[in-house]
A protein has these predicted regions:
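A short, conserved alpha-helix in the catalytic core of glycosyltransferases
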Residues: 2-31
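Nucleotide-sugar-dependent glycosyltransferase catalytic core
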Residues: 5, 33-57
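Residues in flexible loops and secondary-structure boundaries
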Residues: 8, 12-14, 35, 40, ...
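Residue-level recognition of short, structured coil/turn motifs
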Residues: 22, 67-68
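A broad structural signal for alpha-helix termini and local helix breaks/kinks
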Residues: 43, 66-67
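Non-catalytic, C-terminal membrane-associated alpha-helical segments of glycosyltransferases
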Residues: 50-58, 68-120
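Short alpha-helical functional segments enriched in proximate histidine and acidic residues
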Residues: 62-63
Length: 120
């Protein structure tokens, strides 16, 4: 599913395999090597934003796909005003990584909300 960035694609794949009554074998010794090397984003704040934004969006989207998103969405929706406040306060206190963290989660929630409202 192209809506996943990275974090929940394995869960989605396993869920679809199990749905088709197939088995999944986990090999603990297996290793994967990324051909492109290191992360291309060098800016520390961008890394924080990208990681938390995509993780939050992927989590919400995965639970939406399995029709189990209502509780996750409700809990995050309650936190959004606090996240906005914390983002602003941390920005003024020059705790930029914390500010970016809360901003990324807020933005992911709004993107997810936009997606599900478009699908209604």
């Amino acid at each position: 599913d192209e809506n996943f960035f990275l974090y929940y694609s394995d869960f989605d794949l396993c869920r679809r395999i199990l749905k088709k009554k197939k088995t999944i074998i986990q090999i603990f010794e297996a290793k994967a090597q990324h051909d492109h090397g290191e992360i291309k984003v060098k800016n520390f704040l961008k890394k924080i934003f990208i990681r938390n934004y995509n993780f939050t969006f992927d989590e919400l989207y995965y639970f939406f796909k399995i029709n189990n998103h209502h509780e996750k969405t409700r809990r995050l929706k309650k936190k959004i005003p606090k996240y906005i406040t914390k983002s602003i306060i941390n920005l003024f206190l020059l705790r930029l990584s914390q500010s970016v963290y809360y901003f990324s989660k807020t933005l992911a929630f709004y993107r997810f909300n936009k997606l599900i409202n478009k699908n209604k």
